[in-house]
Regions:
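Carbohydrate-binding surfaces of carbohydrate-active enzymes
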Residues: 7, 15, 19-20, 49-339
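Short, solvent-exposed loop/turn segments at secondary-structure junctions
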Residues: 31-34, 64
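Distinct, well-ordered alpha-helical segments
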Residues: 33-47
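Active-site neighborhood of glycoside hydrolase catalytic domains
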Residues: 1-25, 31, 38, 51
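Short, catalytically relevant binding-site loops at active-site mouths
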Residues: 30-31, 261
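Histidine-centered catalytic/metal-binding microenvironments
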Residues: 27-30, 141-143
Length: 339
């Protein structure tokens, strides 16, 4: 019902503006709100609506956006790209200046802040890099004002703008060798809690396995099945569409309620078995495309980056480091251009 109304309103807006304006909606939170009552389980219908030009969502609120993991996408980003839809991310990135707008306990939860400048800086770097490297649009959402009213943050946003503008002349295509597949309808039939355990929680482990991945709805599998070396299927319950994929490709890794506590090392082991290049053999957030690489450390120590043969990096943001020689502190981010 929700998807149908979005398509109807989008068509109405297009007609009334004589197709001069782009039209979009906040919708498709397949990973973030897997509960069957969330009304976010007909994304494929919206992706096939010609009147919808873009879709939006915030960055996941997982674990109050703390350090040490990739703040994941709420939706299967690469299905949007495949269907010609722009993804427009709402970067409502809190800072140490963020204060509750009202004296209501709900707004005092930790999600409304990092409590210090250091964590703010690292979150801003992470949130910019995810958009730059995954090649989508975003805006900094200063929700009720004053969040970025600090010289360091304003300088960072100015620096990011320059990098983003320069990136428009570069190839930001995916180099991922892993695809994550989900059937949004599985969330409608799964037992209570299984959607969260499989589709929501697993994103945290996927994000630190040391190699990038793309994400798709299962309806797009046939079109992309020859593009990737490894497939990870998120199955809170096994639907006919997922079963069809597994029959055709029994080498998929299937994550179910029974094995959803899978570790990052187990994910790396699977990737190795499929010939996937691991940029890190230890837990790390690694975003990579054809022109940029971003590293967010999860632990203290050497970076242990393993680059494909012939690849060289030039650091363009973050405290200057020699990643081949220098031990890095945990929870810090470094952005590089690939030469």
């Amino acid at each position: 019902m929700t998807a149908g109304r979005i398509c109807e309103f989008a068509q109405f807006a297009k007609e009334k503006t004589r197709h001069r304006l782009v039209v979009g909606a906040f919708y498709g939170y397949t990973f973030e709100t897997p509960e069957r009552q969330s009304n976010h389980h007909a994304l494929y219908q919206v992706l096939n609506c010609d009147s919808v030009d873009f879709l939006c969502s915030p960055i996941s609120y997982m674990d109050n956006r703390g350090p040490g993991f990739a703040h994941p996408y709420m939706l299967p980003l690469d299905s949007l790209k495949k269907h010609g839809k722009l993804y427009f991310a709402e970067n409502d990135s809190r800072t140490h200046l963020t204060r509750p707008p009202y004296d209501i306990p709900h707004f005092n939860r930790p999600v409304w802040m990092p409590r210090d400048k250091w964590l703010t800086v690292e979150n801003l770097k992470l949130h910019f890099a995810r958009a730059l490297i995954h090649a989508h649009a975003f805006w900094w959402f200063d929700m009720w004002g004053g969040w970025y009213r600090y010289p360091l943050y304003m300088q960072m946003l100015a620096d990011f703008h320059g990098i983003a503008k320069d990136s428009l002349q570069k190839d930001r295509g995916s180099v991922s060798e892993v695809a994550v597949i989900v059937d949004e309808k599985a969330n409608c039939y799964a037992a209570e809690g299984n959607g969260k355990a499989v589709c929501y929680d697993t994103r945290k482990t996927l994000g630190i396995m040391g190699t990038p991945f793309d994400s798709y709805l299962c309806e797009d599998y046939e079109a992309i099945k020859d593009r990737y070396k490894a497939f990870i299927v998120l199955a809170p319950c096994l639907t006919p569409k997922l079963q069809q994929i597994l029959t055709e490709n029994p080498d998929c890794l299937v994550i179910t309620p029974e094995n959803c506590k899978i570790t990052s090392e187990e994910l790396r082991s699977f990737c190795r078995s499929r010939g996937v290049h691991l940029y890190s053999e230890k837990d790390a957030v690694v975003y990579v495309n054809r022109s940029y690489l971003f590293l967010h450390t999860v632990s203290d120590g050497p970076a242990d980056l393993h680059l494909p043969e012939g690849v060289r990096l030039r650091q363009i943001y973050g405290d200057p480091v020699d990643i081949e020689k220098t031990g890095l502190p945990k929870y810090e981010g470094y952005l590089f251009e690939i030469e």
